[in-house]
């Protein structure tokens, strides 16, 4: 396959926007969310929305179906909000848990997510979601053997629905500084995904949180390209100082440094990460925070600027 024309080829890769950090606060009646989804659809290059799953999707399935149908057919569900909530309450909860009950709870949780996808598709009358991002919880005690078992056990649940199984790498146990997630290392996740249908997604900010080294996302992407396991490349920032969104080194989806000076996410680093993927990614996208009172126009401008830096590779 010829991958020399990277910008042209990258346009054929589904582009996903994690819009949930940008949703307006106090959004009575969800009118702000509806306007954001419509505006993202009107951009013409957003193929899917990354939707968070906590104990449910963040809006009723019929409402979401109305916003997404006819606009986005490459949506991704991320299990990270619910996984973090459950793992915070139960230290053995997770798909990579060495505790049988904790792993069983995580399998049941994941299947409840898949049932929500079924309801969303039923309401829409079409397939909107193509991939689901899973995570190697629990904190501090995850094992690749348990994670492999879970991914294997879920394979039929995913295949029967035509859904791609994605492992989204987060900061690993043994990283630099106080950890945010302390899940499995990338090498352990690669081992866990072997002989399964799972691919692995790199989130720029989450890889940087692990090492406090802005070259880590690029090296993580290269490693996954070499092993044939690269799923997605998601661009999302991180940084060493407290911001309007969160504390230092939080998983706060910081925007580009030109919009948030403490963010380590620069156009050059984005371009280097995209070059490392070399067109091997099965999807790509971005997830950034914007100020709570940002206008819709400003949100679209910030999102468009990140995409511009991705295409600049």
Residue ranges and their predicted role:
Residues 1-95, 100-112, 203:
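N-terminal pre-domain/capping segments
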Residues 2-7, 111, 115-123, 149-150, ...:
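Histidine-acidic metal/acid-base catalytic patches
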Residues 3, 17-49, 147-165, 186-187, ...:
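A structural signal for the main folded, soluble domain(s) of proteins
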Residues 6-11, 34-45, 58-84, 115-127, ...:
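Acidic (Asp/Glu)-rich catalytic clusters
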Residues 19-21, 51-55, 75-82, 134-138, ...:
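A cross-domain feature marking catalytic cores of carbohydrate-active enzymes
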Residues 23-31, 50-64, 140-144, 173-183, ...:
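Acidic-and-aromatic substrate-binding clefts and catalytic sites of carbohydrate-active enzymes
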Residues 84-91, 174-175, 242-246:
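Short acidic/His/Gly/Ser-rich catalytic and metal-binding motifs that mark active-site loops
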Residues 91-195, 298-307:
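Active-site acidic/histidine proton-transfer and metal-coordination neighborhood
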């Amino acid at each position: 396959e010829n991958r020399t024309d990277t910008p042209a080829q990258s346009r054929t890769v589904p582009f996903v926007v994690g819009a949930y950090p940008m949703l307006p606060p106090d959004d009575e009646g969800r009118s702000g969310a509806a306007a954001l989804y419509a505006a993202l659809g009107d951009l013409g290059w957003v193929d899917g929305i990354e939707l968070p799953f906590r104990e449910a999707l963040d809006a009723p399935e019929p409402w979401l179906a109305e916003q997404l149908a006819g606009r986005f057919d490459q949506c991704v569900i991320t299990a990270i909000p619910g996984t973090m909530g459950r793992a915070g309450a139960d230290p053995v909860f997770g798909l990579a848990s060495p505790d049988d009950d904790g792993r069983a709870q995580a399998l049941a949780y994941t299947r409840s997510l898949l049932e929500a996808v079924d309801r969303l598709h039923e309401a829409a009358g079409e397939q909107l979601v193509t991939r689901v991002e899973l995570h190697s919880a629990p904190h501090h005690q995850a094992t690749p053997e348990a994670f492999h078992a879970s991914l294997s056990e879920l394979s039929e649940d995913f295949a029967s629905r035509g859904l791609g199984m994605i492992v989204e790498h987060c900061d690993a146990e043994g990283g630099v500084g106080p950890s945010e997630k302390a899940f499995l290392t990338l090498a352990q996740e690669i081992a866990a995904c072997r002989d399964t249908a799972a691919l692995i997604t790199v989130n720029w900010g989450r890889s940087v949180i692990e090492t406090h080294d802005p070259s880590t996302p690029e090296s993580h992407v290269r490693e996954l390209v070499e092993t044939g396991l690269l799923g997605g490349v998601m661009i999302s920032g991180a940084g060493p100082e407290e911001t309007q969104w969160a504390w230092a080194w939080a998983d706060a989806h910081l925007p580009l440094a030109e919009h948030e000076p403490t963010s380590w996410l620069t156009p050059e680093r984005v371009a280097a990460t995209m070059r490392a993927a070399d067109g091997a990614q099965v999807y790509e996208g971005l997830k950034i925070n914007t100020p709570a009172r940002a206008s819709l126009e400003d949100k679209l401008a910030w999102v468009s600027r990140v995409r511009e830096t991705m295409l600049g590779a």
